[in-house]
């Protein structure tokens, strides 16, 4: 199975793709033409059940009760400011239904007017059954970063913004972020340059920073586990320009972490993308890590 997709981003275009970690092979245009109902290819937009372009950027996918839910930034070409986070659902990762804007712009605060909201990630907390959403908030000059969180009783319901995400009494004031949920239900917050925080039992705060500054200069963090080994993906910092992304491995989330090099052939520039998420696709008795990457362009 190979899946890939295109979406629009900010003032710019945003291409995401889902690739099997084991092969990294892209779907050809001819195979797309033969399987238009089930495969979405790079280079063309997605359309939802309403015939509109899927607007979900910096995205993640969550599987819940046999259905897939795509969360992302709902973007406008008119402004870079936060508009809302969108949710789409699918039973085949190909045909998507627009659910709603699950978290709209707030009247004030971290996600109020003239603020940034990016890299939304959602996990279901196993101890409470609650759905917890995480995001990078900021001002429009990226000078006031803070990780925020929101909660909902249903995966596609209205999320209530709870404010800054903290360790102890201190907000975590960082930029690029991601999340990872281990097979035992433990949740983790991932930060650019390689900080890893273990979440509290209710996922509402961080209880401990396990790793600090693993990858200086790294951003767009994502993690997955395969056959007992943990993989941590990063991109280099090259502003809007694409680069060859790389990875670390470890026998445990707390380390020790060892740099493993590039995870796509050198010079391919991660298929012109930047890491955003790795979705654990359940396939029979196996779980297949599926890479999701953003393709950036600026200003349009």
List PLM regions with ranges:
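Bacterial Sec-dependent N-terminal signal peptides
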Residues: 1-36
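Carbohydrate-active catalytic/glycan-binding domains of CAZyme proteins
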Residues: 7, 32-300
């Amino acid at each position: 199975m190979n899946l890939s997709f295109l979406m629009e981003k900010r003032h710019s275009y945003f291409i995401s793709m889902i690739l099997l970690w084991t092969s990294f092979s892209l779907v050809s245009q001819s195979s797309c033409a033969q399987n238009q109902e089930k495969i979405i290819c790079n280079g063309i937009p997605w359309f939802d059940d309403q015939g509109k372009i899927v607007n979900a950027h910096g995205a993640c996918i969550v599987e819940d009760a046999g259905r897939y839910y795509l969360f992302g930034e709902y973007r406008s070409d008119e402004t870079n400011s936060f508009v809302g986070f969108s949710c789409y659902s699918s039973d085949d990762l190909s045909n998507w239904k627009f659910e709603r804007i699950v978290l709209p712009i707030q009247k004030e605060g971290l996600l109020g007017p003239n603020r940034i909201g990016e890299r939304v990630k959602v996990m279901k907390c196993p101890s409470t059954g609650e759905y917890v959403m995480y995001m990078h908030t900021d001002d429009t000059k990226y000078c006031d970063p803070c990780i925020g969180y929101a909660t909902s009783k249903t995966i596609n319901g209205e999320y209530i913004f709870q404010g800054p995400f903290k360790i102890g009494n201190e907000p975590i004031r960082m930029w690029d972020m991601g999340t990872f949920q281990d097979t035992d239900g433990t949740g983790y917050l991932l930060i650019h340059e390689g900080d890893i925080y273990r979440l509290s039992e209710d996922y509402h705060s961080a209880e401990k920073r396990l790793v600090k500054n693993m990858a200086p200069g790294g951003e767009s963090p994502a993690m997955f586990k395969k056959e007992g080994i943990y993989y941590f993906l990063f991109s280099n910092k090259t502003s809007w320009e694409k680069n060859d992304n790389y990875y670390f491995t470890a026998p445990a989330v707390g380390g020790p972490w060892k740099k493993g090099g590039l995870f796509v052939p050198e010079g391919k520039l991660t298929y012109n993308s930047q890491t955003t998420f790795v979705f654990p696709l359940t396939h029979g008795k196996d779980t297949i890590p599926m890479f999701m990457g953003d393709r950036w362009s600026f200003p349009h």
